[in-house]
Amino acid sequence: MKHGIKKRKLSRCTEHRLSTLKNLSISLINHEQIVTTLPKAKELRPYVEKFITIAKNKNTLHGRRLLLSRLHNSKLAVDKLLNVLASRYQDRKGGYSRIIKFSTRKGDCASMAVIELVDRDIAARGKVYSKNKEGGKVVTQS
């Protein structure tokens, strides 16, 4: 019985699911906006918000080491968390990200969503980056 278990399995084993969430959170921290499936976005949101809270409250060596251990030793993402995002969200108590339903994916009709950080860079606002079949990035206005 699944009493008290509210997490989505995302059709993956535990290690693969955690690795997927870590990789998605690194991408979201670096780019501040990503396009993914709706269940992944809903599962990713509390995961990333905990990282931002750690960066805000524990801007010490211990906090840096906590974030490095939980983000696959991605120094670029940890530096951005501690230097840029922690100062940006210093006055905000929560709700650092938003999920916007996007469209359905053409191949399997999966519901897609845009997850982005609130109060992100003004220059990047309104642009959604998605990959085309050739691997290049296409900018579309949302």
Curated annotation (Swiss-Prot):
SUPFAM superfamilies: Prokaryotic ribosomal protein L17. The keyword Ribosomal protein applies. Keywords: Ribonucleoprotein, Ribosomal protein. Gene3D superfamilies: Ribosomal protein L17. GO terms for molecular function: structural constituent of ribosome. Pfam families: Ribosomal_L17. Signal peptide: none annotated. It comes from the Bacteria. GO terms for biological process: translation. The keyword Ribosomal protein applies. InterPro entries: Ribosomal_bL17, Ribosomal_bL17_sf. One of its GO terms (cellular component) is cytosolic large ribosomal subunit. HAMAP family: Ribosomal_bL17 (MF_01368). Part of the 50S ribosomal subunit. Contacts protein L32. Belongs to the bacterial ribosomal protein bL17 family. This is Large ribosomal subunit protein bL17.
